[in-house]
Amino acid sequence: MMDSQQHGEQLKRGLKNRHIQLIALGGAIGTGLFLGSASVIQSAGPGIILGYAIAGFIAFLIMRQLGEMVVEEPVAGSFSHFAYKYWGGFAGFASGWNYWVLYVLVAMAELTAVGKYIQFWYPEIPTWASAAAFFVIINAINLTNVKVFGEMEFWFAIIKVIAVIAMILFGAWLLFSDTAGPQATVRNLWEQGGFLPHGWTGLVMMMAIIMFSFGGLELVGITAAEADNPEQSIPKATNQVIYRILIFYIGSLAVLLSLLPWTRVTADTSPFVLIFHELGDTFVANALNIVVLTAALSVYNSCVYCNSRMLFGLAQQGNAPKALLNVDKRGVPVSSILVSAVVTALCVLLNYLAPESAFGLLMALVVSALVINWAMISLAHMMFRRAKQQQGVKTRFPALFYPFGNVLCLLFMAAVLIIMLMTPGMAISVWLIPVWLLILGVGYLCKEKTAKTVKAH
């Protein structure tokens, strides 16, 4: 116990640059691309490629804004620290708790996807059973130490990256060697009703779901406190990841939508697996299902890491119970991991009660929390930059197009909320935002009242 207390509030720096780049890459190549893209293809057709380019640009601006702050002050808790320091107490409290809830929801969505992927082979296994099994395994691994997490995520991401590159190359070979038959042609990108078969409306209405795919890039900021050399590794990871994401997303979708008309894609199956299955290549379809399963587990693994570090950061700020500062001899925030796990376990119950609608509901809730998250990063960055300018400090990794880039990001967030209000099944998650902010407000007032009472005594 003495030893545990001695290490009680210290996370260990054990993540190398390769870990940080692959953690961010792994956080973004997941269910959004492999499963969420199916419903976007049905609505936007090949225009999904343009949608991912637009959302990717906004995500890059947000990453650069967070990156500028993190390089100057690499701390646990990432941007909630900046919201707290440069914006105010409630902003720090709200952004930290919102980010934690965001990744709990993402974790739930990924576990739900795991259940769907397992059903590709074993349709009789309910999604809740698969979710429960992998929930236990991944949390157990995260209770070891940060290096084990870093190595595991590194190899998870390597599998995904190699698989997507191999799929692009194999798909391109099928396309240009005529092996896949006359139905496989680049003309599928514009001949099946046009590049935007349902017009701009079809694409615009899908931007919220596309945005779901890019949630996870901010993990670069969360890793800062455990990075060996954040001044070099964070800028490198930030700049390189976005190019790779766009190549993987745009490249893979362009090849897939050339191999088979977009009209053949169904909402409940990964389009990656479906297209090769439709082409009669069951070996590749099975291999890709292993990859998409690995992808979901990889993102869930990142979520477990992220949630525990965010709770740890909130406790350091006094915005969460001090018991969450408990760190064992290996530098693992055990209490934070266990609390996050207990809440995430609700996913198993949701999949038991509503297996058909669980993924769609969780995806909508994730996007609402992500909108709050990205908007707060952008606003906190504006205040951070203003403070640094007043101090005469020149930052080492400045964000792009400040302050116009920030304004563009905020307008994009507002547009996404309007789109969600007009989308059946998503509107409820937008109406829950003011309720959620009210709960955060009450929580903050209670925390402040408790702090004053303690001071008085």
Swiss-Prot record:
Q: In what way does this protein cross or attach to the membrane?
A: Multi-pass membrane protein
Gene Ontology CC entries for this record: plasma membrane
List the subcellular locations. Cell inner membrane
Biological source species: Salmonella typhimurium (strain LT2 / SGSC1412 / ATCC 700720)
Recorded catalytic reaction(s): these are:
L-phenylalanine(in) + H(+)(in) = L-phenylalanine(out) + H(+)(out); L-tryptophan(in) + H(+)(in) = L-tryptophan(out) + H(+)(out); L-tyrosine(in) + H(+)(in) = L-tyrosine(out) + H(+)(out)
Membrane spanning stretches:
21-41, 43-63, 87-107, 118-138, 156-176, 202-222, 241-261, 272-292, 334-354, 359-379, 401-421, 426-446
Chain's role: Permease that is involved in the active transport across the cytoplasmic membrane of all three aromatic amino acids, phenylalanine, tyrosine and tryptophan.
Name the InterPro entries on file. Answer: AA-permease/SLC12A_dom (IPR004841), Amino_acid_permease_CS (IPR004840)
Lineage top rank: taxon:
Bacteria
- Protein name stated in the entry: Aromatic amino acid transport protein AroP
Task: Outline which residue ranges sit on the Periplasmic face.
Answer: 42, 108-117, 177-201, 262-271, 355-358, 422-425
Primary location recorded for the protein, binned into one broad class = membrane
A Pfam family cross-referenced in the UniProt record is AA_permease
Enumerate the PANTHER family for this protein: AROMATIC AMINO ACID TRANSPORT PROTEIN AROP, GABA PERMEASE
